[in-house]
């Protein structure tokens, strides 16, 4: 009897240990804008957004809702084919169309804003977007295909309020070929390029081309592809960390979840 009970308990435990997965398939029949999805992201409010070949969609757990230009309506988008999306800290969504133009979808007003046109008129340029980097403090960085400059846009709760075009050589920017732009817990905005690293509106700038960064317990660690590892201290100075002999490449930095003990 004891053996039987143990066997039943073991079987029950094995059953409860199995993860439950509810897999559902969605298509245009369910309200998705198109069956071809170019990008998908989750906004801070936990809504799932999808960039498709026929507009922008979001899913709230029950239904899909789609936003795009329609015949007879106001034409804002140069194309409904959206290839990349970037939710902001305030739950608006940047959209990049197939011709590399950018638009901001306001979730408050439920409309697209022709940001690309506004930027071109303000700075007298022909913007071709490469990547966007929304930062938690509300700013968004825009990098370009030609690499001659980058753009910093500040967003209010609903709309953009200011933009700044930064050319190579300004604000410590060493190159327009940007690897990554990142905001740390103190609100500092880091720009990582192929020719060096800088913090926007700070004195810190280094020719070391850091490509990876991790923040652990208030400490910031940086690494270059060619094997250089450093810590960033509160004086905004780099402390180089020796690597084991023979290690000449770093492919990534990972946070294991362990925190330093003070």
State where each predicted segment sits.
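Carboxylate-rich, polar loop motifs that coordinate divalent cations or form catalytic acidic clusters
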Residues: 1-262
């Amino acid at each position: 009897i004891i053996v039987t009970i143990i066997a039943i308990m073991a079987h029950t435990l094995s059953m409860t240990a199995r993860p439950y997965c509810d897999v559902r398939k969605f298509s245009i029949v369910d309200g998705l804008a198109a069956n071809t999805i170019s990008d998908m992201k989750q906004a801070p409010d936990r809504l799932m957004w999808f960039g498709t070949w026929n507009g922008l969609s979001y899913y709230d757990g029950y239904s899909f809702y789609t936003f795009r230009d329609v015949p007879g309506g106001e034409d804002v988008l140069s194309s409904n084919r959206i290839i990349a999306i970037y939710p902001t800290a305030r739950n608006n969504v940047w959209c990049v169309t197939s011709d590399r133009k950018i638009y901001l979808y306001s979730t408050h007003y439920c409309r697209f804003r022709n940001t690309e046109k506004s930027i071109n008129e303000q700075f007298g340029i022909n913007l071709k977007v490469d990547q966007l980097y929304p930062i938690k403090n509300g700013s968004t960085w825009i990098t370009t295909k030609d690499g001659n400059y980058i753009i910093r846009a500040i967003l209010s709760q609903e709309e953009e309020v200011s933009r700044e075009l930064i050319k190579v050589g300004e604000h410590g920017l060493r190159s327009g070929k940007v690897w990554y732009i990142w905001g740390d817990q103190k609100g500092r905005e880091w720009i990582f390029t192929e020719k060096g690293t800088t913090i926007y509106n700070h004195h810190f700038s280094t020719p070391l081309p850091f490509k990876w960064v991790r923040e652990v317990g208030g400490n910031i660690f940086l690494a270059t592809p060619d094997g250089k590892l450093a810590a960033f201290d509160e004086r905004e100075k780099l402390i180089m960390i020796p690597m084991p002999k023979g290690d000449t490449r770093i492919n990534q930095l990972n946070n294991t979840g362990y925190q330093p003990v003070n």
